[in-house]
Amino acid sequence: MSNSVLVFFVNGKKVTEVSPDPECTLLTFLREKLRLCGTKLGCAEGGCGACTVMVSRLDRRANKIRHLAVNACLTPVCSMHGCAVTTVEGIGSTKTRLHPVQERLAKAHGSQCGFCTPGIVMSMYALLRNAEQPSMRDLEVAFQGNLCRCTGYRPILEGYKTFTKEFACGMGEKCCKVSGKGCGTDAETDDKLFERSEFQPLDPSQEPIFPPELQLSDAFDSQSLIFSSDRVTWYRPTNLEELLQLKAKHPAAKLVVGNTEVGVEVKFKHFLYPHLINPTQVKELLEIKENQDGIYFGAAVSLMEIDALLRQRIEQLPESETRLFQCTVDMLHYFAGKQIRNVACLGGNIMTGSPISDMNPVLSAAGAQLEVASFVDGKLQKRSVHMGTGFFTGYRRNVIEAHEVLLGIHFRKTTPDQYIVAFKQARRRDDDIAIVNAAINVRFEEKSNIVAEISMAFGGMAPTTVLAPRTSQLMVGQEWSHQLVERVAESLCTELPLAASAPGGMIAYRRALVVSLFFKAYLAISLKLSKSGITSSDALPSEERSGAETFHTPVLKSAQLFERVCSDQPICDPIGRPKVHAAALKQATGEAIYTDDIPRMDGEVYLAFVLSTKPRAKITKLDASEALALDGVHQFFCYKDLTEHENEVGPVFHDEHVFAAGEVHCYGQIVGAIAADNKALAQRAARLVKVEYEELSPVIVTIEQAIEHKSYFPDYPRFVTKGNVEEALAQADHTFEGTCRMGGQEHFYLETHAALAVPRDSDELELFCSTQHPSEVQKLVAHVTALPAHRVVCRAKRLGGGFGGKESRGISVALPVALAAYRMGRPVRCMLDRDEDMLITGTRHPFLFKYKVGFTKEGLITACDIECYNNAGWSMDLSFSVLERAMFHFENCYRIPNVRVGGWVCKTNLPSNTAFRGFGGPQGMYAGEHIIRDVARIVGRDVVDVMRLNFYKTGDYTHYHQQLEHFPIERCLEDCLKQSRYDEKRQEIARFNRENRWRKRGMAVVPTKYGIAFGVMHLNQAGSLINIYGDGSVLLSHGGVEIGQGLNTKMIQCAARALGIPSELIHISETATDKVPNTSPTAASVGSDLNGMAVLDACEKLNKRLAPIKEALPGGTWKEWINKAYFDRVSLSATGFYAMPGIGYHPETNPNARTYSYYTNGVGVTVVEIDCLTGDHQVLSTDIVMDIGSSLNPAIDIGQIEGAFMQGYGLFTLEELMYSPQGMLYSRGPGMYKLPGFADIPGEFNVSLLTGAPNPRAVYSSKAVGEPPLFIGSSAFFAIKEAIAAAREDQGLSGDFPLEAPSTSARIRIACQDKFTELLEIPEPGSFTPWNIVP
């Protein structure tokens, strides 16, 4: 049969593709074939939602059009036949009309960098197409599959809450809509960041119609399809016989419905499946049949359809019949994200046979019956298969044979004496794979609590889902009681062992979870037995009952308070007003252009990297011949294409290489690069390059290993001292020695590193680069190409996030791309895939601190001797400066008269770690907060009282000899304690902890003091350029880069006030080295401080030139003045410059200067609740008070505070980097690396800006805001530690206990020692090789 023609619709337009590639995704097709670049590539594994589009199809079974949010990165374009695709461009634009979904997100300040915005817009749009007025729960579900690294999620939810049934203020009866006044406001403060009344209403009648051509005829559905390429053939049969014949002919063929598993295997494991079968038009696999015994679902029915029908039946049928249904929907809620559940099917989940499948334990415990069919000897054969013991025969294998097809699954109704419950524990609740899950199905003897039959299934404990038959048999005939729990716990520990080196790690935790999840099931079933009257109400102690519960996402409550602008401030003066991000509307419509959105150029090639697969080794052979033999592959680049000098690069020290030269120092180091016609071909060719190695030792991965081998960079350690530490420690009432440790953190900007290099005339090179430091890229590109800098221009219009990760590491991509473009004489492009980016570009520095502190019996700290170690990776990068800031911030807000702080930069065989928001400050302050809590614990005082006792006062000196001016930390503290109802909550928490054994709450107060300036003096400068045109419009250029932090918006505001004109007259096009030269990186939170003052400098020059004209025409307009100036030959272009004064401290050469220009302070109070049985936790509330001077833009600044808090929360609680003992990064995408999602924000999230605190040392009395709030996220960590301490007290354990950051569920559970953890035998460290280690 010849190739079929692919037909589908995109944004109402018919698309016909004659020879579609079965390996092509919908995302690739949209971006490269149709140039619809609003849909973004964020991860390629369906984990971030940046690629979300809406797919509409007519369900002819129900005669209903279904609108589904899907991940375009996983959706095969071949599966779109007969469908209608809607992208963000298709619902509205700034040139025509904004859709309310786009408008509300933008105007509610829900878009910062904007890279995730189109995906979030489309998730919401798809929801509204299915429910005109959704509930808040619908919103929660809709965004399970979307991530945002910038905003902290609050403003997105606030904007979209206006569409919901429950739309109302979170303050309930106290709402200002009821009382008539603002939430907590007074004459000085405001709380409205956006005006809801300005939103255009949603009018469903205006939505695009489903294409009539698809609706009127079933021709697209009834047609069997074949799409073939030279590697893969895609089949879409339309009846069961055709499907079974294909499977008989190609037994190894993969059946693809949602492509959520196969797509990941093909992309990341590089599997090649020559035959793919799409069975979505075979009615037998789509059937839903109901009878008195239960419901039968076809194997290809989507998980969302299953969920919806089961929820309906739960509402309609008696509870006793729907316990399996309820158990299923409970598990489905946490099964991936909605985009995945919309297309994934239960049959795929069963047949994939993942050992951590969420549904297989439920189906195995329930003994589900499966229907299977095959075509043998020309005949259709069917048989039934029982899911239970023996069904899974090995890793991803089961008893269903290769030529057979799973037709469907029976869900039986439960009986009155039957109970089935399931629990799942993951790193993060929403959209995460299980660490361990469990399902327990028990049937009791009639109207009793005597076990008649029980089946228990567990995931995450073996290569397959496993049952526990021996333990189950032990329970038969036994009374369901606490005595049974003890026996079961011991038996499960024996029956389900786990090797100390088992893949996945967390051995003790996983073994503890098996017992703990059973116990949660015991509690849940006991409560149901009690409720039904079978057991007495007091059979289960009241304090144990909450142990049966799981966390649920509450409806968000929030408040944002900021200083009201003066009533006499001109309306056109935007300073201090909550203005919308300048690019927010374009970001919400997909019109905003990022580096990889730039249209492909004639002759352009793609560059793909060959990466090291060894942590430390000599390269003995490098052979690209096989790769170069492929059609469309043009050239291979390696160290041989550069001189030794040209190949040596680095941001400060040239201790790195463009391409590894003779030796590799870590996994993921760039060895070479392949230039080819397109990305897929270049990456395939790169995998064909043969690299042979001679491995070297030792391989050093961890800080402890570096200390053991004395593997430090030259000139370290370094020390900073103040006073006499030895003497003070000797005289102290108390001394204490401690250690604390924290891991690294992946930046996870949604836009990965990208660069496009274009050769121009006269040996010029033009680079478009996702970098925070265009001048550094310019300088190093000139270095590797041996060009003068004036021949190289680097441009950065906007970045899809940066957080420091694009300050120095952008050279990893930009330099090879520039070299290839220069040598080949044609445009070259590269945008790293997420796994490449995470492997290559480094992370936040892990730190280890060892300290000895002396203090009085009242808790006044008198001395501290502290050692700081950071894990730099294999090259220096900026690690020396990160260490210095940690050493300068370790004391946080506390005055310590005698200090010795030493710092070591550890050299290891990891990718070079780099700048990350906070730049060592959060790590240093983390040590300081451990110290203050150690002191409080030892002297027996409340930690807040000890904080107050030790706080710096205005006029005090730090240990690096800077005097503190205008230091308002006490005011921040008192305001925050009041705002958070601290004293009242302490009592509530104490009461809760007394009443609950397996749930505990904790609360923590964390202050912060963050120094504002670059640590290297020469970087504290900025330039600007302002051009005024004849029509009065103003083009502003400055040296900062728009990363999403609102820098361009603030610069426009500054210029508008300085020039006295409306913001709408001012435009910023891009950051470019030919506009403003010799720029500093946009980092260190000083973007607004430096560039804002440079902008003012240029404005002042222009104002001076225009002053005589304004005097001559006092009643004139701006345009008239500019027109007059032009004809008077007055220059309407000016440059500005600013150098931060009074800084550059050095103890010998500049002892009277400051290290930092000033400090930004704040305080946060966070309350958490933990599940002591699983280690799960939930942030109940966070209150933050920040001193940011006179805010330039409260909406942007509060957005920065919330986003920084959530990033800090992730750093200290969720985000764990997983490395092999040899230094290979396991966590290379959102599947394993978990940053906070929508459901992780505090249930109550309040931010208040300190009023009446202008800062004289920055533009318009403002303060820096990007980095300072991040450390407040640690308040969740310290609150968790308080909650753990409460759990340990119930176990009779007192005193301190170790808890590393991040405080993952594993660490929380193991720290909550109890009768279950006591059953575990933990092997001694060193007696085995662990699966993973902490760097």
Curated annotation (Swiss-Prot):
Residues engaged in binding [2Fe-2S] cluster 2: 113, 116, 148, 150
Span of the signal peptide: none
InterPro entries assigned: 2Fe-2S-bd, 2Fe-2S-bd_dom_sf, 2Fe-2S_ferredoxin-like_sf, 2Fe-2S_ferredoxin-type, 2Fe2S_fd_BS, Ald_Oxase/Xan_DH_a/b, Ald_Oxase/Xan_DH_a/b_sf, Ald_Oxase/xanthine_DH-like
Domain FAD-binding PCMH-type: from-to ranges: 227-416
Family matches, as PROSITE patterns: 2FE2S_FER_1, 2FE2S_FER_2, FAD_PCMH, MOLYBDOPTERIN_EUK
Binding sites annotated in the UniProt record for Mo-molybdopterin: 772, 803, 917, 1084
GO terms under biological process: arginine metabolic process; compound eye pigmentation; determination of adult lifespan; glycerophospholipid metabolic process; L-tryptophan metabolic process; purine nucleobase metabolic process; pyrimidine nucleobase metabolic process; xanthine catabolic process
Subcellular location(s) per record: Peroxisome
Occurrences of domain 2Fe-2S ferredoxin-type (ranges): 4-91
Binding site for [2Fe-2S] cluster 1: 43, 48, 51, 73
A Pfam family reported for this protein in Swiss-Prot or TrEMBL: Ald_Xan_dh_C
GO molecular function list: 2 iron, 2 sulfur cluster binding; FAD binding; flavin adenine dinucleotide binding; iron ion binding; molybdopterin cofactor binding; xanthine dehydrogenase activity
Keyword Manganese in record: no
Active site (record annotation): 1267 (proton acceptor)
A GO CC term assigned to this protein in UniProt: peroxisome
Binding annotation for FAD: 255-262, 335, 345-349, 358, 406, 424
EC numbers for this chain: 1.17.1.4
Keywords from the UniProt entry: 2Fe-2S, FAD, Flavoprotein, Iron, Iron-sulfur, Metal-binding, Molybdenum, NAD, Oxidoreductase, Peroxisome
Cofactor(s) for this UniProt protein: FAD; Mo-molybdopterin; [2Fe-2S] cluster
The protein's role, per its UniProt record: Key enzyme in purine degradation. Catalyzes the oxidation of hypoxanthine to xanthine. Catalyzes the oxidation of xanthine to uric acid.
NCBIfam families: xanthine_xdhA (TIGR02963)
Similarity comment: family membership: Belongs to the xanthine dehydrogenase family.
Assembly: Homodimer.
Name by which UniProt lists this protein: Xanthine dehydrogenase
Organism: Drosophila melanogaster
Name of the encoding gene: ry
